[in-house]
């Protein structure tokens, strides 16, 4: 399984649609003004590859056709966040979370 296939398998969900985001303008330091919308077509490997390459903002809908939720995310918009300290807290508490820095400088915590 290549990295794109692994990524799409982690973020699986509803097969009939996906989200897309188009950046409109810089809103403030670190944050961009964007328009997000639903595209009523499946999320494909090509779309995910474009997302991973930084060409397109896409997202899967985490609730599938059977109402099963496959993942969740917390968006932390604290731009002075000490990512190392947060990582250590997650590890010390043995929380089943994956920590990633967001583009704007905050963080995302994913639960699978």
Which positions does each model-derived feature cover?
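DNA replication initiation on ssDNA origins
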Residues: 1-71, 79-86
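Short, well-ordered loop/turn elements at secondary-structure boundaries
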Residues: 55, 67-69, 92-94, 103-106
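Catalytic micro-motifs at enzyme active sites that drive phosphoryl/nucleotidyl and oxygen chemistry
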Residues: 58-63, 87-88, 94-102
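Histidine-centered divalent-metal-coordination microenvironment in nucleic-acid enzymes
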Residues: 73-74, 96-112
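Helical (often loop-to-helix) elements that flank the catalytic cores of nucleotide-handling enzymes
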Residues: 83-92, 112
